[in-house]
Design a protein with these regions (language model features):
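The feature captures the beta-strand-to-loop junction immediately N-terminal to the Walker
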Residues: 34-36
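Helix-to-loop junction immediately C-terminal to a conserved catalytic motif
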Residues: 49
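Conserved ABC ATPase "signature" region
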Residues: 65, 108, 113-137
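Conserved ABC ATPase signature
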Residues: 142-146, 150
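Conserved catalytic motifs of ABC-family nucleotide-binding domains
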Residues: 163
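Catalytic Walker B motif of ABC-type/P-loop ATPase nucleotide-binding domains
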Residues: 167-170
Length: 247
């Protein structure tokens, strides 16, 4: 589903962030990326979404190379990718249901339609996505009233409303308590299976990777250190990813 080949990226100051990087994530699979601060994890996700333009390499979504697209073709292709981060970035004054329904903006309706009110079909679909994340009862509640874990589940439901084929998650549990962390990771694991999504998740929490990932990719200094099924990833290999980090 998602394949990255020979990806390299450097910042204007000349710092190499990614070097000949490659990975693959299949539909129904949850792959976790581990690495220290500044190792290139977030840069990788930003290159995959084409927020950053790689210096070299290919990013394949099914049979489409995103690196070969520009303009409207790129915009439409990017609708197949949904992104969540550690901050849910919800519209706090709007209801949970409205926040979820806006995930379909750009794919199923545009701003002109939205200004006249969200389509009934999308509101109905949004209720279904709230059911998927276990928040049906909070549909009419304002987003400002949500806990951190609830807000992140709403963000995931909003991503589902986009109808993506790939879900990218950048530190999705970084600001949550341990119970909420487990809840969100269980949800991502389940959705990968039930929605046939390719899920690529950047984490700092090593134990969550050992518990929920199908495969774990280690990244150090912009290069792949390992790419293995979680049961084959040694503690020593993970420790080496973080050697030299400030305690």
């Amino acid at each position: 589903m998602l394949r990255v080949r020979g990806l390299s990226f450097s910042y204007p100051n000349g710092k190499l962030a990614l070097v000949d990087f490659g990975l693959a994530v299949e539909a129904g699979e949850l792959v976790v990326v581990l690495g220290g601060n500044g190792s290139g994890k977030t840069t990788l996700l930003r290159c995959i979404t084409r927020t950053l333009r790689p210096n070299a390499g290919e990013i394949w979504l099914a049979d489409t190379n995103l690196c070969s697209l520009e303009g409207e073709k790129l915009r439409r292709a990017r609708l197949e990718l949904a992104m969540i981060s550690q901050h849910a970035s919800l519209v706090r004054r709007s209801t949970v249901l409205t926040n979820v329904a806006t995930g379909a903006l750009g794919r199923h309706f545009g701003w002109r339609t939205a200004l006249g009110g969200l389509p009934a079909s999308e509101l109905k679909a949004a209720r279904g996505y709230l059911t998927d994340v276990g928040l049906t009862d909070l549909a009419e509640q304002r987003a400002s009233m949500l806990s951190g874990g609830e807000a992140q589940r709403v963000a995931i439901a909003r991503a589902l409303a986009q109808r993506p084929r790939v879900l990218l998650a950048d530190e999705p549990v970084a600001s949550l308590d341990p119970e909420a962390c487990q809840e969100i990771m269980r949800l991502l694991q389940r959705l990968a299976r039930s929605e046939h999504l390719a899920v690529l998740c950047v984490l700092h929490q090593v134990e969550l990777a050992y518990t929920y990932a199908d495969r774990v990719i280690g990244i150090r200094d912009g290069r792949i250190a390992f790419d293995l099924p979680r049961g084959q990833v040694s503690r020593e290999a993970v420790r080496r990813l973080y050697v030299g980090e400030a305690a």
